[in-house]
Amino acid sequence: MIPVVALVGRPNVGKSTLFNRVTRTRDALVADFPGLTRDRKYGRAKLEEQEFILIDTGGIDGTEEGVETKMAEQSLAAIEEADVVLFMVDGRAGLTSSDEAIAKHLRSREKPTFLVVNKIDGIDADAASAEFWQLGMSKVYQIAASHGRGVTSLLELALAPFMEELVEESLRDENGEITDLTEFEDFEDEEKDLTEEDAEKDFARLQDQPIKLAIIGRPNVGKSTLINRILGEERVVVYDMPGTTRDSIYIPMEREGQEYVLIDTAGVRRRGRINETVEKFSVIKTLKAIEDANVVLLVIDARENISDQDLSLLGFALNAGRSLVIAVNKWDGLNNEVKEKVKSELDRRLGFVDFARLHFISALHGTGVGHLYESVQEAYVSATKRVGTSVLTRVMKMAQDDHQPPMVRGRRVKLKYAHAGGYNPPLIVIHGNQVKELPSSYKRFLMNYFRKSLEIMGTPIRIQFQNSENPFEDRGGKLTLSQERQRKRLVGAVKNRNKK
């Protein structure tokens, strides 16, 4: 399961700065879908091959009535749900009573906690960090979040238990005490150039696996009723797979020879209905379920307007690149006029996910539930279907013939060839000249062209653009071996002619 890292600390210690730096590229993926609401407190990030969820808990002030009463409930929830806590303090401001109150609470939780002294750029880092030893943490780590100094190394240490390579030993100083991480390179989320070999590994990993289906949505939309309907119809023996108390319930089942694993989340509460703690717990469970799923089934209540929280859940699913099916529940009992209004509203607000199948169902009575399987399978097949380089290149050239790429700095962008870069979601890698300069409008055109030509339904498509290297670049006017030989022949011919 994907790890969750929580940023904890009093206001203005740099939590948001660190959050924005670490999640900036991953968050940008949502921008491909205009009109989508993004929750900025929760972000996906990736360090090497390790994906993780980062939570900005907001500021905590425990100075007046004690940390248990003054902490925001969502921050408490995030601490409980997190696998790792990064406790941030301000190296310039020094130790405060709020820091001490927060540290006391964190020590009582026995959670893997890293004390991070931020804002040490331009000052004596060791001197600024010394007083924070009073907080009783086993180690003190030093970073400058605004410049990214030490961030990568800190994350490597925090995520070491979840990564294949443990890097803690190589980063420990001679005394094994204060680890100054600022000498290491800045945190950069560079895009890895994906190859056909990467795609084949991805494809092999997905073979002979059950379809993992996460059923998500706010409470009272009928999610539990739908799960019971599905399991009741299939007459399967239900048992809970091993997991921690904070994980979702995994339920294996089979239908018509196809194996599934249903991931039952706790749902996401709307603020005002219940307290913040339960809501935040639910968000984290849902995020982890989405990451672990192949296909996400979002359940929406037909009798309530689609909410920003519904759109935020969609954003998480799209950001994770998951296949998507949408079920509009409680459709029975609505008159035709109301149904038309609901359809119109859904078309208006869900236009950016027109690739997802939309079903109108009644989980209580079973109406339309059977058709969900068809869309789930269609989405999964689309997300994992192997497509060869020749086919992808042919489709790319057809798109280029139909609509030429624009000019960039007086030169026409040239698309050379395309190949698969991964699956679930399908990732297409396009090579060419100046392809990274293509405008968003042309990238969307290519995405839609591939979708239509390859009949991909139910899953987002990602395209990575790689500039082809010029084999003559940086040669400084040097001739190739064949050119050198030709030059010698020409010089020899001229000399012979002059002798005559």
From Swiss-Prot:
The keyword Repeat applies. GTP 1 binds at residues 9-16, 56-60, 118-121. The keyword Glycoprotein does not apply. GTP 2 binds at residues 217-224, 264-268, 329-332. Residues 3-166, 211-384 form the EngA-type G domain. Residues 385-469 form the KH-like domain. Associates with the 50S ribosomal subunit. GTPase that plays an essential role in the late steps of ribosome biogenesis. This is GTPase Der. It comes from Aliivibrio salmonicida (strain LFI1238) (Vibrio salmonicida (strain LFI1238)). The gene is der.
